[in-house]
Structure formats: structure tokens, C-alpha cells
Amino acid sequence: MSETQEFWLISAPNLPGADIFDQVNQKTAKENSLSENKKFNTPALRVGTLNSLITLNDELQKIDTIVESTTKKIARQLVDLVGTKPGKDKSLSINGHTIPQYLQQFAWDDAKYNLKLSLQEIVEKISSAVSKIDDDLKIKSSEYSTLSSSVASEERKASGNLQVRTLNDLITADNIVQTDYFTTAFVVIPKQSEKEFLACYETISDFVLGRSAKRVAQDNDYFLYSVILFKKFYENFKTKIIEKKWVVRDFKLEDNKPTQERSKLTEDKKNCRTSLIRWCRLNFPEAFMAWVHLKVVRVFVESVLRFGIPFNFQAILMKPQKGADKKVRDILFDQFKYLGSAHISGKNETDDSEKFYPYISVSVNWEN
């Protein structure tokens, strides 16, 4: 069973002569062992105008949700393919680091998201890149799903009883007589009806070749027999067999081709699976890093809007211990309530909505 691993990115303004991180760490980690904390360095991004920040802030949470969804879809796809939990699969690493290590050692990728770009340009770049990854995932996973369904369908055909299963791998050219005048009928009968069938098949219809019945295959409940007769009486023979509650399986020699097609489908599925695993392992880090960079933009934008400029705030990465969320939130509330009750609308820390915190709080939730 997977567990949700939650990280918080919080932010609060620095105070003269006080280290915000030390204060938070003292009360949540050193004194109470409720959380693992790490200073989180946010870069000096371009602020732009107040209106542009407000507009961008309205868009960020929606984009965040979309990017998160794509990132987790890639991880789930890989889990489905290899059967390994997302947090346990070593292939789900970020430049050789585990997910917690990457978050704790985060450094802004200036080569990919140049700090000279505006915030809007950075967000658009992230959104565009992840959108393409998502489109590629849909195409590749759809292809694999289609192949899997086709293979499963063929396997079902080959695994049923003789009344319904494919006969492609049971009947060979040696079982068939096919000339201008003669044809071969394939009859499925219950095992308990074998004696009755052998006693009557020669006379059940006109122009059935005597002593032509040969057992071709059997399963737990049925026998498959071949019978040679004149072509023009095939339909009459079939009708008489059906009247006996037996089954005639229509089959032509060229129907053997699906056996080769099934083998090809199986091979295609195997190759597609290998390709999709490789793609997921290459693109998961790209999507995850884009997601975390977007979280950083969110923290920066909300901090500037909340605390003003020149910006002088400290971001902290927190990983609360399991079951300690409320206690940590209560400590943070007491620590930062001086920032103003206007930000919490009279609500206390039992409400887990980010907008009610007097400090900035952005969550990074991950299943492992």
C-alpha cells in the first residue's frame, strides 16, 4: 500500500536580528521532533508589475494542478509497467537523487529557466514543456493499451473451450481435405456424446464420407472431430448437427494466419512496453523538476504579494512526521500569527486550506 509523503514549502518575512529558519527548526524539530526542516533557497526572480503578479497568481494554482497530474501519471504508468512503488523505484530519480534528496538540495536550473525571463515566460515555458510530455504520454500509453487489449483478446480466444476458442493452433493442413467437390467440417461434441456422434455422423446428412471422422483435439469437456463430405451438402450437414445441440466450427486453412498475427502482437506489445518504460524513466525527472520549479514560482509570487518589496523572506522546506501535521501547523500559527489575522479570516490551523495561513504554504505531496 502506498503512503503519501508530504512536504511543505513555507515562507515568512525575515525579522531584524532573528533567523526565521532557526526559530521554526527549534520549535518543530529540535524541541519536539515533529518535522525535518531545510532552508530552501528561492532565486531573485523578476517581479514585474503588481497587476501581472496578481494575474499570474490566479493562474498558478491551476497550472500547478495540471503539471502535478502529468508528473504523477508518468509515475503511475511506470508502476503499472514494472510493478514498483513510485518512491521505491530507483529509476524515478532526479539527476541521481531520490525525490526527498532533490527537494532538500534544490537549486534553480538557470540554464533551463533563465532568471532574466519574466515570471510569465518561465511559467509558460514550464507549462508548454509539460503539456508536450502529457501529449506524448497519452499517445504512447494509448498505443500500449491498445496492444495489451488486442493480446488479451487473442489470449481469451485461445483459452476458452473448443466451442468458442480459436482453432488456429489446433488445425493443420493435414486435418483438412479441400477439393472442388469435397470439404471438411469440424464438429465440437460433448465427451459424453462421442459414441452417439460416431454412430450417426455418416447418416445424419447425405453424402458424408464413411469412416472419415477423426478426432483432432480435446479439452476437459469436448472433442473436436473432422468429417469429410461433399461441399454442396455442407450447410445441410451443419443444420443437422445443430439440431443435435452440437456445434460446427467454420474454418478455412487461411484462418491459420491469425496465429502468426498473435505472435506478432505479443512481440509488438513487448517492444512497446520496453519503449514506454524507457520513455517514463527519461521524462519523469523532466516533469518533476518542472513541477518543483513551478512550486518555487508560487512561493515567490505569493510572498511578494503578501509581504511586499523589496522582498526579504525565507523559504523553508518542511517534512512533517506522520500524524504530526496539526501539531506543526499549530506551532507555525503561534510563530507567525503576528503577520495579521486578516490572512486567516478567523479560522484556526485545523483548516488545511493554504489561504488561511498567515504565512505562505505550498504543499508538495508525493506517494511512495
Swiss-Prot record:
Pfam family, one: V-ATPase_C
Entry GO MF terms: proton-transporting ATPase activity, rotational mechanism
Cellular component terms (Gene Ontology): contractile vacuolar membrane; early endosome; lysosome; pathogen-containing vacuole; vacuolar proton-transporting V-type ATPase, V1 domain
Keyword Transport: yes
Keyword Transcription regulation on entry: no
Keyword vocabulary terms for this entry: Hydrogen ion transport, Ion transport, Transport
InterPro entries: ATPase_V1-cplx_csu, Vac_ATP_synth_c_sf
Role noted for this protein: Subunit of the peripheral V1 complex of vacuolar ATPase. Subunit C is necessary for the assembly of the catalytic sector of the enzyme and is likely to have a specific function in its catalytic activity. V-ATPase is responsible for acidifying a variety of intracellular compartments in eukaryotic cells.
Subunit structure: V-ATPase is a heteromultimeric enzyme composed of a peripheral catalytic V1 complex (components A to H) attached to an integral membrane V0 proton pore complex (components: a, c, c', c'' and d).
Family under the similarity heading: Belongs to the V-ATPase C subunit family.
Protein name according to UniProt: V-type proton ATPase subunit C
Species of the source: Dictyostelium discoideum
